[in-house]
UniProtKB/Swiss-Prot annotation:
Gene (UniProt): rplJ
Function: Forms part of the ribosomal stalk, playing a central role in the interaction of the ribosome with GTP-bound translation factors.
Similarity remark: Belongs to the universal ribosomal protein uL10 family.
InterPro entries: Ribosomal_uL10 (IPR001790), Ribosomal_uL10-like_sf (IPR043141), Ribosomal_uL10_bac (IPR022973), Ribosomal_uL10_bac_type (IPR047865)
Gene3D superfamilies: 3.30.70.1730
Gene Ontology biological process terms in this record: translation
Annotated keywords: Ribonucleoprotein, Ribosomal protein, RNA-binding, rRNA-binding
Self-association and partners: Part of the ribosomal stalk of the 50S ribosomal subunit. The N-terminus interacts with L11 and the large rRNA to form the base of the stalk. The C-terminus forms an elongated spine to which L12 dimers bind in a sequential fashion forming a multimeric L10(L12)X complex.
Pfam family, one: Ribosomal_L10
GO (cellular component) term, any one: ribosome
Organism (species): Mesomycoplasma hyopneumoniae (strain J / ATCC 25934 / NCTC 10110)
Gene Ontology molecular function: large ribosomal subunit rRNA binding
Domain of life from the UniProt record: Bacteria
Protein name: Large ribosomal subunit protein uL10
Amino acid sequence: MNVSFSIAPYFFKERRAKLNSFRKRKVEIVAEIDSLLKNSSSLAIVEYRGLTVNELEQLRKEFKSAGVLSKVYKNRLFKIAAENNGYLDLQTDLVGPNLFAFGTTDAIAPAKIIAKNAKEQPLLILKGGIYDNQVVSAAENALISALPSYTEALTMLASGLQSPLKQLAFGLKLLIDEQKITA
């Protein structure tokens, strides 16, 4: 009987140390999520239930090539970090298996990539997220995915400015060729 009591303190001490290491790891993960929420320009939450490993890996490769950081976290730990940063409205989207895509360089890239892949893979569901430090719903995230990226917007602006000048130059060239005006 005394033997069992002498083993018990050792057993509980070891178990307590193991639980403390798990708790430390969870605190580190919450700090990592907290840092990502503060330093990224956007966040898109996507549910990936039913996707194969190959489909998920392909999605992650697309994220990586676009400069988007994608991670899978436990919803409870993400919820704690979101509350710490004042994003209380995200809690409704934190159900089921979620992939968190953080836009580090282009704020629209995560939503764009998810929307593009959701057309090919209907099991991929774009949920809410964060854009411009505001919590957005799934519908708003879908609208954001339709916006042009920064480089696309600049290209559209440049072509819009260049088109009238091209037409003017072409018209003047025709008038010169017909010799209605002199150069």
